């Protein structure tokens, strides 16, 4: 049996921009993408601490320190909102019990403070 389990998390990132006229996605700085063990086009869930919104989108590479929601997702956040970005993986139950997710903590400038 496979189950969904937390694979990666960027904890308490700050939204730096919201671009309604872009095709879609979340732009994340490359250093955070790598640190969180994410890849471009990977599905992620966004949890907005400020307004309680939870929604899915996909990752694209952005500028250093950038957390920008694009397209329709831009309507779900405000610049300055604190968000948690999570990705899940499907794996066998036994493997999932031993699996350790990648968790990256950032400061209010989206700089890594703890991995």
Swiss-Prot record:
Pathway: Cofactor biosynthesis; (R)-pantothenate biosynthesis; beta-alanine from L-aspartate: step 1/1. Signal peptide: none annotated. Is synthesized initially as an inactive proenzyme, which is activated by self-cleavage at a specific serine bond to produce a beta-subunit with a hydroxyl group at its C-terminus and an alpha-subunit with a pyruvoyl group at its N-terminus. It comes from the Bacteria. Keywords: Autocatalytic cleavage, Cytoplasm, Decarboxylase, Lyase, Pantothenate biosynthesis, Pyruvate, Schiff base, Zymogen. It is found in: Cytoplasm. Pfam families: Asp_decarbox. Transmembrane segments: none annotated. GO terms for molecular function: aspartate 1-decarboxylase activity. The modification Pyruvic acid (Ser) is found at residue 25. Its EC number is 4.1.1.11. It catalyses: L-aspartate + H(+) = beta-alanine + CO2. The active site is at 25 (schiff-base intermediate with substrate), 58 (proton donor). Its cofactor is pyruvate. The keyword Cytoplasm applies. Its main location: cytoplasm. The keyword Glycoprotein does not apply. Binds 1 pyruvoyl group covalently per subunit. GO terms for biological process: alanine biosynthetic process; pantothenate biosynthetic process. InterPro entries: Asp_de-COase-like_dom_sf, Asp_decarbox. Gene3D superfamilies: 2.40.40.20. GO terms for cellular component: cytosol. Heterooctamer of four alpha and four beta subunits. This is Aspartate 1-decarboxylase. It comes from Campylobacter concisus (strain 13826).
């Amino acid at each position: 049996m496979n189950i969904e389990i937390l694979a990666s998390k960027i904890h308490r990132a700050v939204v730096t921009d919201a671009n309604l006229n872009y095709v879609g996605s979340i732009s994340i700085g490359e250093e955070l993408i790598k640190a969180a063990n994410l890849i471009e086009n990977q599905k992620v869930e966004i949890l907005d601490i400020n307004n309680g919104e939870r929604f899915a989108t996909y990752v694209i590479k952005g500028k250093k320190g950038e957390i920008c929601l694009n397209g329709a997702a831009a309507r779900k956040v405000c610049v300055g909102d604190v968000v948690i970005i999570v990705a899940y993986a499907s794996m066998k139950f036994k493997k999932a019990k031993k699996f350790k997710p990648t968790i990256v903590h950032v400061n209010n400038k989206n700089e890594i403070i703890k991995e």
